[in-house]
Amino acid sequence: MDMEEKPKYGEPRKFDPSFKGPIQNRGCTDIVCCIIFIIAILGYLAVGILAWTHGDPRKVIYPTDSMGQFCGQGKLEKQPFLFYFNMMKCASPMVLLEFQCPTPQVCVQTCPNRTMTLITAISKPQDWEYYKSYCKEDPGHKAAAQILKEKLCPAYLVSSNPFLQRCFPSMGKKGEVITVGDQEKFSDGVNVLDAKDLMAGMKNASIVMEGRQVAMKIFEDYTKSWYWILICLLIAVVLSLIFIVLLRFLAGVMVWVMILMVVAVIAYGIAHCSIKYVSLKDTPGSNITLQQLGFQPDFAVYLHIRQTWLAFIIILAILELIIILLLIFLRNRIRVAVELMKEASRAIGYVMSSLVFPIFTFFLLAIVIAFWGVNAVFLSTSSEPVYKVFNETECVHSRETCNPENFTSSSMKSDCPHSQCLFAFYGGETPYHKYLILLQFYNVFLFFWCANFVTALGQMTLAGAFASYYWAFDKSKDMPAFPLCASLGRSLRYHTGSLAFGSLLLAIVQVIRVLLEYIDHKLKGAENKFAKFLLCCLKCCFWCLEKFIKFINRNAYIMVAIYGKNFCRSARDAFFLLMRNVVRVVVLDKVTDFILFLGKLLIVGLVGIFAFFFFSGQTDAFKGTAPSLHYYWVPILTVLVCSYLIAHGFFSVYAMCVDTLFLCFLEDLERNDGSAERPYLMSENLLNVLKKKNQAN
């Protein structure tokens, strides 16, 4: 007799009269992974202590002179500005590679406001006293030739202005002629130079600082607009709460209202962009392409180009078309999903504390992000000053490491008489500095692991609470008094290892994706098409793998919360259960996710429209109230991103509730048959949706 073939996706759940929801008598799961996670956390704290001991964030904030000292700090507190002896030396291409001009640099109290040479200043006592404040050290009574040979003082001073704590020549124009300090020409003590000779050096030095200038303007915009940003985010919170409450009582109506309002908001966006596109038709310069315009630090320039608004119209139109087509083809399934959301609304009504639980998760995530950020800053600034040989002409020792204290008597100086030993960058040769890159990698990896762990803890806690609701035959009597707290306690006490296991798998894939993005960035200029194709395939595969692991983890945590089994068994059971009901997974679960996404989109759209009209100053009602900003898109983008995160936090409760109830009623269908002995535990509405019914006793 042939042996009976086992089902491909396991046996359906059997009826168990003793099963009353999340099992109370359970043991610890995945203990080995729990121990590894605790050790990793202790190591993470050790890395933090090590970084805080060696790091110095001032290295990325303050300019550094040729000796590696911070301008405006310590004994140089009254000398906040960095002065370059010869700005024209900054025209070297090495400036863009090493971020260091091959000329002496000193910290000064103020930037020079006069133009003079060493030769003329040394003969006038009053001018000489002023001139010496821009020397590396007091030259005493040395002759001008000796001072220049030892590079104690600059050959000339040029009237300058401070920019990002650095002194740059005050460039101007008289007609078409470039001037410096209102002069077309100046002397360096030997030759008469044109003011334009300084431009190349200034250009390279300013390129290094241009990114910081944009960052400083953005920071300044935040200081002016943070109060209004918080108000916009408060509006997002209020809107999210209103939608959650309305979903509690008017789930069916609210779902269709959300859908129609999202369509309306996108339609308004298309109309607004079209009006802008047409209004710029006769504006001079508006017809140039984005490619011709190139990158501009002032992003408001792009809003005066017709092609920008055309791109917005196309993107919004495609999004609108996709949503409308999905609504047409999924209209029947949306009705089913509405009933599932109504059941989720009732579950949340019994576990009202779940609505504020995202705040707890957000708080833990904020701690993880802050710890990672502080560690990253301190690790990146824990190097020691490294000095290199700089020379204007070819030198055998060029870019070699040197010691400024004995450089003048070293063989390097004798081989290259015109060379200088200048501060180049921060590095180090100690064991700590040699393994610094590994510590930075560990910091990134633990960040992903801990962030995923916090997210997993939130998911398992909510799953346990909502499972308690579903499997309670009498909701008012059989549910625990504090289902959320009870579920959180079970998750931490018994399943820290399972949470760590699932989040570890996800962290590994995410770190690999980060490395692939880094490699892709490095190979952007490469011509090897096969390497690019292979890298693109790897990125696509790992993106899909990350999505799959997130899906499996989410359902595995639900099964762990209910049955208390280890991660692997729970993941297998959840996967098999879903595969045995694969059609229902698509019909109910994913359509519900789409509806919740539309809710997030609606909240972001409403808050984003308000933020746009407020910060752009295009509405008369806000002109006297809105702050004056360099880039008004900075607070708008911030509001959009944070509004989405806020909406996601509140709607994630609904999403987790739906996923949990979905798995529970799939098991309910397998365990029970609607008879008096084995009645379904789902609500009457769900029974009607699934065309099932309980028999009367």
Swiss-Prot record:
Q: Give the Pfam families listed for this entry.
A: Choline_transpo
Matching InterPro entries? Choline_transptr-like
Annotated transmembrane regions: 31-51, 227-247, 250-270, 310-330, 354-374, 436-456, 499-519, 594-614, 633-653
Q: Which residues lie on this side of the membrane: Cytoplasmic?
A: 1-30, 248-249, 331-353, 457-498, 615-632
Mapped to this chain, the residue ranges on the Extracellular side of the membrane are 52-226, 271-309, 375-435, 520-593, 654-697
| Superkingdom, natural source | Eukaryota
Q: Does the keyword Glycoprotein apply?
A: yes
What is the name of the protein in this document? Answer: Choline transporter-like protein 2
Q: Which organism is it from?
A: Danio rerio
Traced from the root, the source organism's taxonomic lineage reads: Eukaryota, Metazoa, Chordata, Craniata, Vertebrata
Name of the gene this protein is made from: slc44a2
